[in-house]
Amino acid sequence: MAVLPIRITGEPVLHAPATEVTVFDDDLRTLVADMFETMDLAPGVGLAGPQVGVGQRLFVYSWTDDDGVLWRGAAVNPVLWTTPAVPESIEELDEDDESEGCLSVPGERFPLRRSEGALLRAVDEHGEPFEIEAHGWLARVFQHEYDHLDGVLYADRLVHPYAKQVQKAIRKASWGGPGQSWLPGRDHPEG
């Protein structure tokens, strides 16, 4: 297994829709193992193919819920359905409960409204189908990682005033162009 460089916002692969995985072989399983190692070292709760420079529809996740249940796996060619979310215009964002970050916008956290529930259907790295009905934080993780597969970063979904704040942070860090990455275990994501 190897730790992979995590691409930073501005890298073209992060801003383009990923393609379907068509070959389920040892190379795919090695990529998934490397993604787990990278995510764990970062540390993160999810990591999508585009974040490590692979424009394919797959992500890994690892999160322990309030009951101590570990949710860990790989989702290849996922489909995600979500429940409706309450618009920010009706209910203010909770900066503690709804704040999230992204390994491709390292060191930054902002509140973002997500759906409370999600249904994930995918196959694993061996091509075995599975389905997970997720609520709360796990639903948030799935939505965040699924967005990456469509070329959307959480920073793209932020509303005022957070959208302006994240753009300022991106400019201050000199991100936003191709060729920037960081390596978990070597680089500190907050500079």
Predicted regions and their residues:
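Active-site rim/adjacent substrate-binding subdomains
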Residues: 1-143, 148-191
